[in-house]
């Protein structure tokens, strides 16, 4: 398929890791490099209205090639890779005709094993693109970028009937800022799809409601030998707080539609401790109940403390479940499912145990479910993607454009 693998390998060669806790958007210079490269490529392909905002959102339009009042649709991917694992000097391995068993990742001890990742059993005979065991791969979401770019080329070269196709590439999705500076009005699509999913057939329109909880604990430190009745150990208070959080509602104990509390970081001394939790739940009422639970725990543990010692809790909502917005427009899912079936793929509707730019965009007036990329094991050195899965994603994008052209606004 037209330059698909070449594009992907080109994009992952650029280090575009985003960085949390940074004010500027994009948060890293590497993202600008990929955005400028993509802008140049879009212009070379002849797309119109190619714009790159000061906040790093790249937009372009492939004009309709058929007359009529056809709804404009969009496809969106993000240029950054996760801060969780290095994205510098990515050295992909190409494993053709995978025959099963362990795949050595580079020259070290790291392997990609079907024992740990049973999905490999389903991928026999396919071409796998893996890491060398030292970095992530960047299929999340450079596979999506390569697929969108290739689909644009296919639509042009084969003169497939389509309406206006908008594309956008966003920064800082992995640190939750990807959609904050997205101009929905300028994008001017009736609906869109993020291309940021996993295995072939995945179609996602439900995601977690998400919030962050930051807890500041101020204690009182004195010499341990004279501490009775005076010392207030902030670390002990932190331990008591975590002991009150339901242990069976953590990420490692939940799946499917189950929500969780996750202690993401904790640091401190006797004098001061800080805890950072994330809260996730698909159900809005349960989500609100989880936030109340954290407030109740903080009040309980902080009861009776000396006035100079205290527990401060700040809860900030991150994003909400896009289901309530997407289901108002069922044809968006119908078209995607039909496109998959037309490409001999059985759609797999499943909840996202996470979030996407599409979740925020759906609440900004742009309904935006998520399509598969063909990638697996994101955010780590065991990440990989199949070439066949990427090719299927291109076919689905093209077919969605074609099916939409058969509709009238």
Swiss-Prot record:
<feature type="binding site">
    <location>
        <position position="140"/>
    </location>
    <ligand>
        <name>Zn(2+) 2</name>
    </ligand>
</feature>
<feature type="binding site">
    <location>
        <position position="78"/>
    </location>
    <ligand>
        <name>Zn(2+) 1</name>
    </ligand>
</feature>
<feature type="binding site">
    <location>
        <position position="196"/>
    </location>
    <ligand>
        <name>Zn(2+) 1</name>
    </ligand>
</feature>
<feature type="binding site">
    <location>
        <position position="379"/>
    </location>
    <ligand>
        <name>Zn(2+) 2</name>
    </ligand>
</feature>
<dbReference type="GO" id="GO:0008237">
    <property type="term" value="F:metallopeptidase activity"/>
</dbReference>
<feature type="binding site">
    <location>
        <position position="140"/>
    </location>
    <ligand>
        <name>Zn(2+) 1</name>
    </ligand>
</feature>
<comment type="function">
    <text>Cleaves the N-terminal amino acid of tripeptides.</text>
</comment>
<feature type="binding site">
    <location>
        <position position="174"/>
    </location>
    <ligand>
        <name>Zn(2+) 2</name>
    </ligand>
</feature>
<keyword id="KW-0645">Protease</keyword>
<dbReference type="InterPro" id="IPR001261">
    <property type="entry name" value="ArgE/DapE_CS"/>
</dbReference>
<dbReference type="GO" id="GO:0008270">
    <property type="term" value="F:zinc ion binding"/>
</dbReference>
<dbReference type="InterPro" id="IPR010161">
    <property type="entry name" value="Peptidase_M20B"/>
</dbReference>
<dbReference type="Pfam" id="PF07687">
    <property type="entry name" value="M20_dimer"/>
</dbReference>
<dbReference type="Pfam" id="PF01546">
    <property type="entry name" value="Peptidase_M20"/>
</dbReference>
<dbReference type="InterPro" id="IPR002933">
    <property type="entry name" value="Peptidase_M20"/>
</dbReference>
<keyword id="KW-0031">Aminopeptidase</keyword>
<dbReference type="InterPro" id="IPR036264">
    <property type="entry name" value="Bact_exopeptidase_dim_dom"/>
</dbReference>
<feature type="active site" description="Proton acceptor">
    <location>
        <position position="173"/>
    </location>
</feature>
<keyword id="KW-0963">Cytoplasm</keyword>
<dbReference type="GO" id="GO:0006508">
    <property type="term" value="P:proteolysis"/>
</dbReference>
<comment type="similarity">
    <text>Belongs to the peptidase M20B family.</text>
</comment>
<feature type="active site">
    <location>
        <position position="80"/>
    </location>
</feature>
<keyword id="KW-0482">Metalloprotease</keyword>
<dbReference type="InterPro" id="IPR011650">
    <property type="entry name" value="Peptidase_M20_dimer"/>
</dbReference>
<dbReference type="GO" id="GO:0005829">
    <property type="term" value="C:cytosol"/>
</dbReference>
<keyword id="KW-0378">Hydrolase</keyword>
<dbReference type="GO" id="GO:0043171">
    <property type="term" value="P:peptide catabolic process"/>
</dbReference>
<dbReference type="GO" id="GO:0045148">
    <property type="term" value="F:tripeptide aminopeptidase activity"/>
</dbReference>
<protein>
    <recommendedName>
        <fullName>Peptidase T</fullName>
        <ecNumber>3.4.11.4</ecNumber>
    </recommendedName>
</protein>
<keyword id="KW-0479">Metal-binding</keyword>
<keyword id="KW-0862">Zinc</keyword>
């Amino acid at each position: 398929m037209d330059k698909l693998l070449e594009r992907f390998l080109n994009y992952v060669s650029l280090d575009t890791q985003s960085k949390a806790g940074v004010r500027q958007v994009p948060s890293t210079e590497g993202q600008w490099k990929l955005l400028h490269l993509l802008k140049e490529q879009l212009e070379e392909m002849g797309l119109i209205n190619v714009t790159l905002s000061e906040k790093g959102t790249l937009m372009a339009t492939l004009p309709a090639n058929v007359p009529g009042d056809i709804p404009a649709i969009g496809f969106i991917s993000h240029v950054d890779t996760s801060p969780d694992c290095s994205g510098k000097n990515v050295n992909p391995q190409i494993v053709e005709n995978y025959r099963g068993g362990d795949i050595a990742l580079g020259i070290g001890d790291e392997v990609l094993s079907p024992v740990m990742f049973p999905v490999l059993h389903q991928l026999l005979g396919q071409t796998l693109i893996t890491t060398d065991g030292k970095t992530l791969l960047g299929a999340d979401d450079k596979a999506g970028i390569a697929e969108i770019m290739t689909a644009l080329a296919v639509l042009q070269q084969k003169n497939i009937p389509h309406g206006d196709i908008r594309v956008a590439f966003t920064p800082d999705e992995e640190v939750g800022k990807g959609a904050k500076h997205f101009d929905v009005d300028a994008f001017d699509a009736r609906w869109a799809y993020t291309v940021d999913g996993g295995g072939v057939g995945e179609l996602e329109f439900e995601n977690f409601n998400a919030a962050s909880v930051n807890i500041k604990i101020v204690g009182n430190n004195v010499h341990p030998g004279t501490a009775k009745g005076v010392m207030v150990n902030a670390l002990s208070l932190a331990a008591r707080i975590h002991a009150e959080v339901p242990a069976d509602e953590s990420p490692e104990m939940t799946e499917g539609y189950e929500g969780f509390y996750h202690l993401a970081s904790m640091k401190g001394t006797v004098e001061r401790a800080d805890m950072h939790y994330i809260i996730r739940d698909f159900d809005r009422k349960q989500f609100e109940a989880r936030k109340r639970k954290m407030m109740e725990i903080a009040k309980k543990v902080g009861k009776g403390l000396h006035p100079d010692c205290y527990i401060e809790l700040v809860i900030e909502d991150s994003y909400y479940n896009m289901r309530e917005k997407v289901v108002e427009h069922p044809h968006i899912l119908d078209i995607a499912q039909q496109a998959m079936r037309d490409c001999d793929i059985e759609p797999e509707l499943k909840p996202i145990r996470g979030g996407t730019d599409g979740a925020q965009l759906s609440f900004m007036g742009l309904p935006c479910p998520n399509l598969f990329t063909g990638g697996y094991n994101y955010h780590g050195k065991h990440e990989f993607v199949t070439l066949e899965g990427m090719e299927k994603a291109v076919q689905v994008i093209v077919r969605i454009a074609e099916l939409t052209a058969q509709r009238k606004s």
